């Protein structure tokens, strides 16, 4: 209670401490701020109180703002501090304002009482409360109190509990082992080991040899500086004979070179690269082969999560979408585990050392470019071990990985013939994410189609932004007038057409029907690319139209949506998911515009089933190919239906996170999700 009554204004949380034993460096992540609004300085001290040199960068914490735990001006209260030091010794962070100081020992999950309380609030929900009660019943009060002190960020028990509940059971593994498939491909699992810890080596190999599907081989190429790995494998797994192939390399050829040596040993029908310290689920191979009974996919991938090595629990799941071309160009979301048909490997070759750090990213691109199909197995079957030396714990320590990823994307574009494409790394702290800007050449005419009823000031805001903010100038505006009654709107129409030779106003006489109005207006557009636009929108990002056009020019794309914000700069639209919110709903609504959301999805380009027609660019040829909007959808569902028709024809729907607009739709109205509208859908 003394700690809770502490009158200090400095609140902090030390969320993670990563100690790199090889480089003698320590990285601390957390957050700190003063309740008085004063700036907080950070210093690093050794056990004798001597100040040490360190690198610090601020990290946004929109989650704390979202839960009203800190004020918006404290959004950047997060920090990462990195310094050289002996991981076996004790160090401190010194937090200082003009009025006070707090000296805090560097240890994981070190909180103030209020900091602990606030961290719990950000994780509070019905499931977490249920999990807490179960933990109390199973472990007693004493262990429960100790667990509470460790904080909610310890390992993410909510996911851990879910995963263990749905994990394949021993009886199911036994059944799988007896199942006879019509097609029984040999799976080659290739591993490059390098001074691998015995504990990790055993877990890695055991999760291969205990698979429920038995037609596999494990190919290990060892570039270690000692013969410890070789001795262990031969002593403990010699009985597996040719199923486990081992080669001691005459030198360390680097990650790509060592992996290629392992790939050269493989003679299976499908190949997959497996990291030497990671873990597989025991039904992984079974699920892959089961999928291949339906179709001989050239490439397949699974979901994955992280294995917290300190606490031996699973955390941070990556529930991946089915193959998303734009998402893959924004981040290597596929990663583990990725199976490739041998004929694809024979054609594209193995890893390339010039992409070390993102060698798998480059390899995935080259394989998919040649593949007949990419299949996603929606099960977590791979666990990426997270320990102090891993990239997962301290991304900044391996910045070269991300510049290599940038070059991998650029090489991909060159191979497929996309010219004048610009690839940029996302700014700190979003390492490993990329922004592609596609060329707009030959800069075609874009027709901007705006239905309108009265609301002169609203329409003027929209149109003014098209002329004064937007930088793509080859456009025309077609306004579809529908039953307006205000005199000033007609005066505004006249003024627009006199001042601008690229504005046309046409009149639709019928009652309001969004689909009919847009189908009618489409006939008056001259451009091959049409931006369907609500009158209550406004350009924020000057390159928004160019961003959308660059994507829409790609032959495989049918429609491109934008990132739309409410007036208070929270998200109104960042993609539409069918089945969400009753029938089809906007994702990431109400989060801050800079919030990374889940796996950065609202901040990067990716593919969705649909995007909103409040701001949607379409190829006119594709729009006509599907006969435009279905006019039975008078108000709602028309945009989702249109996008699904595009998808049926094989065209992609792209969400462009960098095409930023305001959409002044009333937040109280929300998306079109009334029972009547769901029934219409």
Predicted regions and their residues:
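Glycine-rich, basic loop-to-helix element that forms the pyrophosphate-binding segment
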Residues: 249-266, 508-525
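A conserved acidic beta->alpha catalytic loop
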Residues: 214, 222-232, 251, 481-492
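N-proximal low-complexity "stem/linker" segments adjacent to membrane-targeting elements
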Residues: 141-207, 414, 418-468
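A recurrent flexible, glycine/aromatic-enriched loop bordering the glycosyltransferase active site
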Residues: 256, 313-343, 515-516, 579-621
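Short aromatic/hydrophobic "clamp" motif used to bind/position activated sugar donors
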Residues: 271, 530
